């Protein structure tokens, strides 16, 4: 079927839903014939996909030549005028004219001159009326996104019989109009082509990328399939465009079909295609398939490595990510600052301080000056590994600081409980003329909440509105509720919730529920829990917290009711998980697990010695944290199997004497483990840094930085 008939049968652009289903069926059959597995049901991640210009520049803009070459003085008028000497300019190659920057002329003025010149020469044969000349001028219009000039050039091309049948010019016109957000004009150029031989792969690709560029990936994919129906062999660029559309649509089925076409191709597949295919599988959560594509690539550039590392970082597959980074170094791949900026947040998430320091060493060894985002990530990594002093060192040596730099440093102090440093840095920030924003005040207010600085926190909330003109957002009200609730001012916290200009979120009710846990307020806690069960019916943390409130009040029947409610709703308590980095490996421990380690002779020896030492210091298990109706001995054994205790014992065995122990946990630390950690830090003379979901706990010589307030 001819392409014109295909499109006319569809009607208005954008009404392609039915045809898209046909596309999926067609490509799916093709993939099955090629032996590429197709699944009808795939669990997709909700993460949106943004294409990086550095990954696939062809998918966003056609590469543009530089416009910054200075015009030779010989081609200006002898009197020094800024106008162009047309007689002399007709003698120079066209490319040197279009991509030349006459002294004192803006790019807009330069395009005006160029278009005027080519309009004047269009009526007579000259070296300015060639396809090459128009191609270069269209390049300039695309670069400047100049629709006004583009329409003039389009008119000249379409009225010139020797130019309007040039596929390269057609593709450039389509690109120009799509870049200028005029898909209607791009589509008209495409549809008005009556000679199918002019619809080359580049023209089809230009139309497809036009749709993709303007947020219509489904239409881009339909153009690609129509091209196949017209017996046009897709090239690497067209395949890249189609795969990008699959990524945007999260359509793995069609993507696998295109993968099948790639497998059958005899031509060499370039890295751009593989990079997009890699992204498709990674964004679909199919990391094993993505790794197969990666391992099967004959050539891999830094973009390819960065793509895989980035997704592994986002999905918290940290061990694989670290191994890939080391392999990248072994293969002498020159990583960019973007690589390190991607890895550092992963180090932050699992408190991988050793790997973070390794990256810092790479930065120091490099001759290239690190950019601000990289230093911000480095600062954040140290803060979230509990090394706030190193964060401050990085902050102090930064020659250029943006607002994010100040906010990160404030947050590093806040999460580590250094409220005095938070206040001092904030005052310095104001004196330096840096205007705070909403993120600044989240760090400040959360720091006040964690350290019990109630009055200062309340005054800061007012200053935010009156002095700094920052309108409080929902997260600021959540901090305010937390500040009041933790101080025992439950009624005031409830009043804030009732009068604030936002509908209370789960974080608001969660803050209130935690305050009720701290102060044993059952009645208000039940109100908060009721709201949370509606907003987050499958969040086990809410059920556990209200169970703790009932358990502390010895209301065991209510504890049983909560447990039964969880069973009926299919809610399971999230398993406690802790991890530590020892040497270059991340060790993960799950509550009640680690049987092989717990049955080892080294564990039994250290654990026995440790328990004897802490019992002599007066420790006895607080079994109230166990909400099951079992005997006290069983409860004590369960508490001893909590993941942070396993991680601590492992670190005592496998690290040198005096080396700080750093643990990250996926849940809030329980009261008994908190007491246990304090005594362990005292009897072993070790600094223990535990980061739970709420804050940092620095245990030093039997004292915690949170002052038992968390």
From Swiss-Prot:
Keywords: Repeat. The keyword Repeat applies. Signal peptide: none annotated. Residues 508-583 are annotated as: Type E motif. GO terms for molecular function: mRNA binding; zinc ion binding. The keyword Repeat applies. GO terms for cellular component: chloroplast. PPR repeats lie at residues 166-196, 200-234, 235-269, 270-304, 305-331, 336-370, 371-401, 402-436, 437-467, 473-503. Residues 616-710 are annotated as: Type DYW motif. Residues 584-615 are annotated as: Type E(+) motif. GO terms for biological process: chloroplast RNA modification; cytidine to uridine editing. InterPro entries: DYW_dom, E_motif, Pentatricopeptide_rpt, PPR_At4g14850-like_plant, TPR-like_helical_dom_sf. Belongs to the PPR family. PCMP-H subfamily. PANTHER family: PENTATRICOPEPTIDE REPEAT-CONTAINING PROTEIN. This is Pentatricopeptide repeat-containing protein At3g14330. It comes from Arabidopsis thaliana (Mouse-ear cress). The lineage of its organism: Eukaryota, Viridiplantae, Streptophyta, Embryophyta, Tracheophyta. The gene is PCMP-H57.
């Amino acid at each position: 079927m001819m392409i014109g008939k295909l499109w006319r049968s569809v009607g208005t652009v954008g009404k392609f839903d039915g045809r898209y289903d046909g596309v999926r069926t067609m490509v799916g059959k093709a993939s099955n014939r090629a032996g590429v597995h197709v699944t009808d049901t795939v669990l997709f991640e909700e993460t949106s996909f943004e294409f990086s210009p550095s990954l696939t520049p062809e998918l966003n803009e056609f590469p543009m030549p530089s416009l910054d070459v200075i015009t030779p003085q010989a081609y200006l008028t002898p009197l020094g005028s800024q106008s162009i000497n047309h007689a002399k300019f007709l003698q120079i190659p066209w490319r040197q004219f279009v991509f030349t920057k006459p002294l004192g002329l803006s790019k807009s003025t330069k395009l005006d001159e160029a278009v005027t010149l080519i309009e004047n020469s269009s009526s007579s044969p000259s070296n300015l009326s060639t396809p090459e000349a128009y191609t270069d001028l269209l390049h300039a219009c695309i670069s400047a996104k100049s629709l006004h000039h583009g329409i003039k050039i389009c008119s000249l091309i379409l009225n010139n019989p020797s130019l309007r049948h040039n596929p390269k010019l057609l593709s450039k016109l389509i690109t120009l109009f799509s870049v200028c957000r005029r898909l209607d004009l791009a589509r008209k150029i495409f549809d008005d082509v009556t000679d199918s031989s002019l619809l080359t792969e580049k023209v089809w690709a230009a139309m497809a990328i036009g749709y993709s560029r303007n947020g219509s990936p489904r239409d881009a994919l339909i153009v690609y399939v129509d091209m196949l129906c017209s017996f046009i062999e897709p090239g690497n660029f067209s395949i890249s465009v189609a795969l990008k559309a699959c990524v945007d649509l999260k359509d793995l089925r069609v993507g696998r079909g295109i993968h099948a076409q790639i497998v059958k191709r005899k031509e060499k597949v370039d890295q751009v295609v593989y990079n997009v295919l890699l992204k498709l599988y990674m964004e679909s959560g199919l990391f094993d398939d993505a790794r197969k594509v990666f391992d099967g690539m004959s050539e891999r550039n830094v973009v390819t490595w960065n793509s895989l590392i980035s997704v592994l970082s986002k999905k918290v597959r940290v061990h694989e990510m670290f191994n890939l980074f080391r392999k990248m170094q072994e293969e002498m791949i020159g990583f960019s600052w973007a690589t390190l900026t991607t890895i550092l947040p992963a180090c932050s998430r699992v408190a991988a301080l050793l790997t973070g320091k390794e990256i810092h060493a790479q930065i120091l060894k490099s001759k290239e000056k690190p950019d601000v985002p990289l230093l911000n990530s480095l600062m954040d990594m140290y803060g979230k590994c509990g090394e706030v002093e190193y964060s401050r060192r990085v902050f102090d040596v930064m020659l250029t600081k943006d607002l994010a730099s100040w906010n990160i440093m404030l947050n590093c102090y806040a999460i580590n409980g250094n409220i005095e440093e938070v206040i001092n840095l904030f005052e310095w920030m104001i004196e330096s003329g840096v205007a705070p924003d909403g993120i600044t005040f989240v760090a400040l207010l959360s720091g006040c909440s964690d350290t019990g600085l109630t009055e200062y926190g309340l005054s800061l909330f007012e200053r935010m509105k009156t002095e700094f003109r920052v309108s409080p957002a929902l997260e600021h009200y959540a901090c305010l509720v937390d500040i009041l609730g933790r101080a025992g001012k439950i009624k005031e916290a409830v009043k804030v919730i009732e009068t604030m200009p936002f509908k209370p979120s789960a974080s608001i009710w969660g803050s209130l529920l935690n305050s009720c846990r701290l102060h044993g307020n059952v009645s208000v806690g039940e109100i908060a829990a009721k709201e949370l069960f509606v907003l987050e019916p499958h969040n086990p943390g809410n059920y556990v917290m209200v169970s703790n409130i009932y358990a502390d009040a010895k209301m065991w029947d209510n504890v049983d009711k909560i447990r039964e409610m969880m069973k009926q709703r299919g809610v399971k308590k999230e398993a406690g998980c802790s991890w530590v980095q020892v040497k270059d490996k991340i060790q993960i421990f799950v509550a009640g697990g680690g049987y092989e380690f717990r049955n080892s002779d080294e564990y039994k020896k250290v654990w026995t010695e440790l328990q004897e030492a802490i019992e002599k210091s007066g420790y006895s298990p607080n079994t109230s944290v166990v909400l099951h109706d079992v005997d006290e001995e069983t409860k004590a054994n369960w508490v001893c199997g909590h993941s942070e205790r396993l991680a601590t014992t492992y670190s005592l065995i496998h690290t040198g004497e005096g080396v700080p122990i750093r643990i990250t946990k996926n849940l809030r630390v329980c009261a008994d483990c908190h007491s246990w950690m304090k005594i362990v830090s005292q009897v072993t003379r070790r600094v223990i840094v535990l980061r739970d979901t709420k804050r940092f706990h620095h245990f030093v010589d039997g004292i915690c930085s949170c002052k038992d307030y968390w």
